[in-house]
């Protein structure tokens, strides 16, 4: 069942560590508190099997909770009898796996103890409105004096036939703030005491953003 789980964590930044061969490796640091099951969905009532998990508990007095959480969410947590969380995520599971889980069950980094590689999903950094050279790596025009253009896209269509620009062509537009998954990242270290996971390489998003960690889809076994 644990091989099907996806858990939420927080990107803390990047550091350098030495591996067992003495090589300096750039690592991303992911902190991960316990993910708590807040709802269980079964095929007979919901049409599919899944669990909903919460992370980053909101610890405030109940009388001020309405200032942090909207009423529908408060009612949702009260119905399940769970604590109130800032982040929620639904994970599809098999029928057998759902039957093994109960409300309030907690999952943490121990899920990945025997895993050598993981996939990490997150929302990439927003870059705002950008041109084609930054978005797609276009070469641009001549940089010399007298050039008609330097950073333009260049030709984007023909003349009378077809007499239009094909849709989907690469143009200047908004860049970033999209869901990105980086696959098959090597797990360097898991610190259960500090609740920290070190993975080789970069992961999506800025520091402090929420990322989703799962067992690599390319992992063997």
Swiss-Prot record:
On whether S-adenosyl-L-methionine is a keyword of this UniProt record, the answer is no
What's an example of a GO molecular-function annotation for this chain? structural constituent of ribosome
* Protein name, entry field: Large ribosomal subunit protein uL3
Role played? One of the primary rRNA binding proteins, it binds directly near the 3'-end of the 23S rRNA, where it nucleates assembly of the 50S subunit.
Q: Which GO terms describe its cellular component?
A: cytosolic large ribosomal subunit
Keyword Ribosomal protein listed = yes
Recorded family membership: Belongs to the universal ribosomal protein uL3 family.
**Record-level GO BP terms:** translation
Could you tell me which Gene3D superfamilies the record lists for this protein?
3.30.160.810, Translation factors
- Taxonomic superkingdom: Bacteria
Quaternary structure, per UniProt, is: Part of the 50S ribosomal subunit. Forms a cluster with proteins L14 and L19.
The record ties this protein, via InterPro entries, to: Ribosomal_uL3, Ribosomal_uL3_bac/org-type, Ribosomal_uL3_CS, Transl_B-barrel_sf
Q: Which NCBIfam families match?
A: L3_bact
Key words, A-Z: Ribonucleoprotein, Ribosomal protein, RNA-binding, rRNA-binding
């Amino acid at each position: 069942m644990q091989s099907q789980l996806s858990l939420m964590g927080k990107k803390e930044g990047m550091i350098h560590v030495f591996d067992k061969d003495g090589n300096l490796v750039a690592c991303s640091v992911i902190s991960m508190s316990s993910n708590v099951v807040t709802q269980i969905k079964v095929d007979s009532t919901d049409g599919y099997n899944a669990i909903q998990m919460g992370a980053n508990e909101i610890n405030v007095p109940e009388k001020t909770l309405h200032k942090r959480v909207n009423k529908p969410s408060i009612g949702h947590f009260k119905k399940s009898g769970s604590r109130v969380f800032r982040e929620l995520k639904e994970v599809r599971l098999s029928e057998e796996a759902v039957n093994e889980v109960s409300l309030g069950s907690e999952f943490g980094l121990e899920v990945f103890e025997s895993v050598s590689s993981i996939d990490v999903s997150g929302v990439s950094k927003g870059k705002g409105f950008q041109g084609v050279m930054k978005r797609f790596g276009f070469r641009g025009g001549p940089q010399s004096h007298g050039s008609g253009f330097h950073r333009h896209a260049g030709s984007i269509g023909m003349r009378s036939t077809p007499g239009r620009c094909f849709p989907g062509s690469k143009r200047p537009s908004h860049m970033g703030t999209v869901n990105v998954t980086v696959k098959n990242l090597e797990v360097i270290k898991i610190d259960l005491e500090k609740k920290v996971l070190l993975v080789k390489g970069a992961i999506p998003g800025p520091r402090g953003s929420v990322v989703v960690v799962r067992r690599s889809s390319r992992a063997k076994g």
